Amino acid sequence: MAKYRDYLPQIDGDFFLTRGGLETTSVLQGNVDVSHCAAIELMKTDKGRARLRAYYAPYIDIARDAGAGFILEAPTWRANTDWGQRLGYTAASLSAANRAAIEMLHGMRIAQENRLPIVVSGSIVPLRDGCKEADEMHPCEAAQYH
């Protein structure tokens, strides 16, 4: 499942694209309401997962047409313990949601990998908001939290 775990092809200087603004696009253009701008919420339903696949597809096409690779970033930005609790997840259900998101992207990669290299990536926001300087964590605090 983890094709590039030990070697990331973008490190060699090849051109890779990634998505942009999943949460903003989902809310403003897709008319989708997700709690706390947490795109992981879209993983809860078939319709939400279909929206995610439809969101990623044009980006993959652009990368292919440009002769680039693609970094397929999971909808897991706000899928950490702090945000998960606000969203009503238990530790087990949050772990399952994160894993399901990555598994979905692996399926997308497998379907497209003959067309271009695709790296599946999952990011989780730091504790608190992560967008405010006051919310920054010391590296030791982050290591303990995550």
Spans of model-derived segments:
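Domain-level signal for soluble alpha/beta catalytic cores
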Residues: 1-146
